[in-house]
Amino acid sequence: MNTTPDMPTPRALRELTPLEARILGVLVEKQHTVPDTYPLSLNALTAGCNQKTARSPVMNVSEDEVTTAIDSLKHLSLVMEGSSSRVPRFEHNMNRVLGIPSQAIALLTILLLRGPQTAAELRLNSARLHGFADISSVEAFLDELAARAQPLVIRLPRAAGARENRWLHLMCGEVNVADFVGPDTGGGTDSVPPSEFEALKAEQKRLADEVARLNALVQRMATELGIDVDAPGDAG
């Protein structure tokens, strides 16, 4: 799985912003999924950044914000602007700048667009970018990306209750692993966030109060009608 002899020497890069990372992911994705419209116009690139499906997190950015991020990526040689069209169009240059093969680019792209993924999820979600024969081949490329002098991905510890480890990109810098693994509950089950737990307690109290109010209403109506609601019903 090593890079070929003619693969460019990887360059050291600064940390990317979340929007810069999203732009790179969109450019690679659309290069494979809609090749007829690639390189992308600013409008198409912005739409891809704000896409609601296959994105985590979902963004809502303007063309001005995308333009600013593109200019920064140009300085890093990660994005190039075509000159053959009256409408500016943009393409990525990740293979040459990062010095990694297309298979690794495909995996990195999915992580840029969708957030943490297991190797199985990466194989499934990258199918339109590259067809991996099996999960072990996916893991081999991921291991290479993680073993670089400047690692591009990290393998997260297995979360409580999870069957597989997830992988996360490091294009935006080092991460706090605990933010993605979550607390160990010791019981192998997913933990409930404190805010959700408080909401459940409030809902439980509201329902209990409603039941008490209805019981009082029934008792009052029964008294007015002379009915003993505690008496057993007729057997026959």
From Swiss-Prot:
InterPro entries listed in its UniProt record: DUF480, WH-like_DNA-bd_sf, WH_DNA-bd_sf
Signal peptide residues on this chain, from the entry's feature table: none
Domain of life: Bacteria
Family indicated by similarity: Belongs to the UPF0502 family.
Database matches in HAMAP family: UPF0502
Record-given protein name: UPF0502 protein Bamb_4889
Organism: Burkholderia ambifaria (strain ATCC BAA-244 / DSM 16087 / CCUG 44356 / LMG 19182 / AMMD) (Burkholderia cepacia (strain AMMD))
